[in-house]
Amino acid sequence: MRLCDTDIERYLDQGIISLTPRPSNEKINGATIDVRLGNSFRVFREHTAPFIDLSGPKEEVTAQLDAVMSDEIIIGENEAFFLHPGELALATTLEAVKLPANIIGWLDGRSSLARLGLMVHVTAHRIDPGWEGKIVLEFFNSGKLPLALRPNMVIGALSFEVLSGTAARPYTSRKDAKYKHQQSAVASRISEDK
């Protein structure tokens, strides 16, 4: 069952769910809590690679990804990151999220931003039970104009559901968890898939 606003507030007060820094209670609405944009970004570099072979040997996939992904880009508090039409970028939420092993979270974009063509997550909007870290956003501008994104702007909303039981393999206890405790816009680690 999805948590309502009063349950989200209570779970935050009791430390069952943690968002750091904690948003004010005014940011809790109905069944969601607003999250803001952090200052860490990554983009695809200009490149001439014809493709990335995602099923190739791990070393080759890693080398191909390293060749096309930028280093981390840190934007100052009063600066803007410009996402141009047709571009994909990675970013993070300002808030770090910590969930227990019996709660799953969901990230949704804002309708007001979607109406401008901004997709906040391309496909990955699940926050696994036992997650600890910032949420990486997969931005895509499907609109016609560049969009100026600034740290601290409300970028999405989280909702939470209590599972039917406690997960036996929560994210932080998994040895194969590729993005455990992430604090920045971590590039794809698909080459670590088993």
From Swiss-Prot:
The keyword S-adenosyl-L-methionine belongs to this UniProt entry's keyword annotation: no
Catalysed transformations (reactions): dCTP + H2O + H(+) = dUTP + NH4(+)
Swiss-Prot/TrEMBL keywords: Hydrolase, Nucleotide metabolism, Nucleotide-binding
InterPro entries: dCTP_deaminase, dUTPase-like_sf, dUTPase_trimeric
Pfam families: DCD
Chloroplast found in the keyword field: no
E.C. code: 3.5.4.13
Origin superkingdom: Bacteria
Enzyme class: hydrolase
Active site: 138 (proton donor/acceptor)
Biological process, per Gene Ontology: dUMP biosynthetic process; dUTP biosynthetic process; nucleobase-containing small molecule interconversion
Gene Ontology molecular function terms on file: dCTP deaminase activity; nucleotide binding
Binding locations of dCTP: 110-115, 128, 136-138, 171, 178, 182
Pathway where it operates: Pyrimidine metabolism; dUMP biosynthesis; dUMP from dCTP (dUTP route): step 1/2
Function: Catalyzes the deamination of dCTP to dUTP.
Family recorded in the similarity comment: Belongs to the dCTP deaminase family.
Protein name: dCTP deaminase
Naturally occurring in which organism (per UniProt): Histophilus somni (strain 2336) (Haemophilus somnus)
